[in-house]
Amino acid sequence: MCDDEVAALVVDNGSGMCKAGFAGDDAPRAVFPSIVGRPRHQGVMVGMGQKDSYVGDEAQSKRGILTLKYPIEHGIVTNWDDMEKIWHHTFYNELRVAPEEHPVLLTEAPLNPKANREKMTQIMFETFNAPAMYVAIQAVLSLYASGRTTGIVLDSGDGVTHTVPIYEGYALPHAILRLDLAGRDLTDYLMKILTERGYSFTTTAEREIVRDIKEKLCYSALDFEQEMATAAASSSLEKSYELPDGQVITIGNERFRCPETLFQPAFIGMESAGIHETTYNSIMKCDIDIRKDLYANTVLSGGTSMYPGIADRMQKEITALAPSSMKIKIIAPPERKYSVWIGGSILASLSTFQQMWISKQEYDESGPSIVHRKCF
């Protein structure tokens, strides 16, 4: 679809990153952090064009003087004014489109409060005057992107991790499980264990540095105990990282202790099953006849599934839980960081999807609750 005139806009509002672009494209045009930053200091230079708030990459680049806030926490919008700023930035600065001319596809995590999607709907129609909109479930879109209609998706982003079993295109709502343990919690945990090494990171700007360390150096150990022993015995696992001021820090067992939290949430004091057990529990809530297909089509998606070694570890853990004869296949597509967006792009450009949009007219007749009737 090369004419962006009628192309739908696809906006995947993650807790950590916002991915936006046009339906029919194979990748998002704009990917920026879901951050709104406000200055901590008073402006003294007149005519500098200082703003009272910055969004996305601009906030990231000026983070030294800003307080950074993420308006989406655990997949739920906690600050609607900031959220509106992010959408405004998405449409007018990143995509450079008029939202009143394009249908908009938004995404959200399953088991979100109903009020969350109602408010999303309201803002799209009333603030941005969109002609039509739709709210899709993130994991379902990831499955579309992998070209399957059956499988279980483990989608782990910055704010929320969830497992959604889908059979022949139908999500099985009773078996959807959600875990509020994701990338941001891992970043916080890494900040904590780096403090034990004598590196103190406290401000919102420094948290972004730790996030970068996490994304560049962390990996998932196949055998945690053995890896800990290796790390204690030699310095082969140590890596160094250069901070923005030129100081170099060394990190060792923190590299795999951080992502290990996904498998052992007790590390951060959470009383819940790890991602492997959550996936298994989700499969066990499904009908006995379809479990075989789910085990063989376990799809990873989201940025927190990007750790090297995580697919092998999942394979090992689920094999240990499942019946011994079961064929288990973990699918980790290389583009899984963006698979929710890619699935949205596919969905919004299907001819059969066109009657699914909630139109402005329907919204005017029924109000925000229309979203529960028309979106899964």
From Swiss-Prot:
Keyword terms: Acetylation, ATP-binding, Cytoplasm, Cytoskeleton, Hydrolase, Nucleotide-binding
Modified residues (N-acetylaspartate): D3
Pfam families: Actin
Gene Ontology CC entries for this record: cytoplasm; cytoskeleton
A Gene Ontology molecular function term of the record: hydrolase activity
Propeptide: 1-2
Similarity-based family: Belongs to the actin family.
Name of the featured protein: Actin, cytoskeletal
Organism: Heliocidaris erythrogramma
